[in-house]
């Protein structure tokens, strides 16, 4: 089968279409004939040599895909060949065929295009896991999400809008802030012109937010902690702004704050199954009824994966970048 491969770590130019062996599903696996695959920041890091796949995972890029079930393992009874599905992957999405654990597969809603389905699993499940499961977001609470125009950010806005959670976001331009507000954010802070810590204090009358979802890391740590309400939770899912920072632990102790690091890719199949189950239990009706959908920025053919990576690296995108495969 055809897939995007690279012989050595490097910039976007190392990506090329190559022939690789067709993957075979295990007893609890589903094989998908891929129609579309989402592009995520982790793909760029892996291409650069900084984020290797977990043991046993495909070395092919791609943490989510959508398409039609092509084959199922002997112990899979809940999903049938021929069904349209979207799946969370540990790797392998940039290919004509991909294998996913059955527990990480969701049926594609009738109204979704292939591009929307391919853009959905990784970012919506990341936002759900970290805001709703780990940080306990619920109606009446307030959260801050950095990178409101990213795939995770736009997904978080959609989930919070559906759950009546007040959501503030940061974004890097007036235009992105406007689009975040159009999606349903309660406040959008242009981090290039505004101090998000001060904005949070003003908008919460000094209380702070109950949870923060952050992909920046070190550069934002002190200001994130200062922006939390009593017993608030900071969930860090990336380190784009550095991995090291100094922090006054007295503030954590005095305000009983939690700082948690979180990833999705390396979790066990059992963990991912439970995350999908919990997501569908909480938001399945909204998904089926068309109240949840990803914001798709752009769609590139598979052979232009390098251009898709350049688009993401530029920071100009709003929402998800998708590869059209089938």
Q: Model regions: which residues?
A:
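Adenosine-nucleotide cofactor-binding segment
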Residues: 161-223, 272-275
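NAD(P)H dinucleotide-binding glycine-rich loop of Rossmann-like/cofactor-binding domains
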Residues: 45, 78, 84-147
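Short glycine-centered segments of the SAM/dcSAM-binding site in methyltransferase folds
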Residues: 84, 142, 166, 232-233, ...
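NAD(P)H cofactor-binding loop motif with strongest signal on the N-terminal glycine-rich segment
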Residues: 147-148, 216, 239
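Glycine-rich beta-strand-centered segment in the early N-terminal region that forms part
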Residues: 21-38, 50-92
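Mid-domain Rossmann-like dinucleotide-binding core that forms the NAD(H)/NADP(H) cofactor-binding site
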Residues: 119-193
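Glycine-rich phosphate-binding loop and adjacent beta-alpha segment
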Residues: 171, 219-291, 324-326
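C-terminal capping/lid region of NAD(P)-dependent oxidoreductase domains
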Residues: 1-4, 289-298, 306-326
């Amino acid at each position: 089968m055809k897939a995007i491969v690279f012989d050595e770590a490097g910039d976007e130019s190392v990506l090329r279409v190559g022939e690789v062996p067709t993957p075979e599903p295990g007893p609890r696996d589903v094989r998908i004939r891929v129609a579309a695959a989402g592009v995520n920041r982790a793909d760029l890091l892996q291409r650069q040599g900084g984020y290797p796949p977990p043991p046993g995972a495909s070395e092919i890029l791609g943490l989510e895909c959508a398409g039609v079930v092509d084959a199922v393992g002997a112990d899979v009874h809940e999903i049938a060949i021929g069904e349209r599905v979207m799946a969370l992957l540990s790797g392998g999405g940039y290919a004509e065929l991909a294998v996913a654990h059955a527990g990480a597969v969701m049926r594609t809603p009738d109204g979704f295009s292939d591009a929307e389905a391919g853009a959905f699993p990784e970012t919506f499940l990341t936002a759900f896991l970290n805001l709703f499961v780990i940080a306990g977001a619920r109606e009446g609470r307030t959260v801050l999400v950095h990178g409101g125009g990213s795939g995770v950010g736009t997904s978080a806005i959609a989930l919070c809008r559906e759950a009546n959670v007040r959501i503030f976001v940061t974004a890097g331009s007036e235009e992105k802030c406007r689009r975040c507000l159009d999606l349903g954010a309660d406040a959008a802070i242009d981090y290039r012109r505004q101090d998000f810590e001060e904005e949070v204090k003003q908008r919460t009358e000094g209380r702070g937010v109950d949870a923060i979802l952050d992909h920046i890391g070190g550069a934002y740590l002190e200001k994130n902690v200062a922006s939390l309400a009593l017993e608030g939770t900071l969930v860090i899912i990336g380190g784009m702004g550095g991995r090291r920072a100094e922090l006054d632990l007295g503030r954590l102790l005095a305000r009983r704050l939690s700082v948690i690091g979180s990833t999705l890719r390396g979790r066990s199949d059992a963990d991912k199954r439970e995350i999908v189950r919990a997501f569908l239990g909480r938001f399945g009706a909204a998904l089926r009824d068309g109240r949840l959908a990803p914001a798709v920025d752009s769609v590139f053919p598979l052979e232009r994966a390098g251009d898709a990576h350049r688009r993401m690296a530029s920071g100009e995108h709003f929402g998800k970048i998708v590869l059209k495969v089938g």
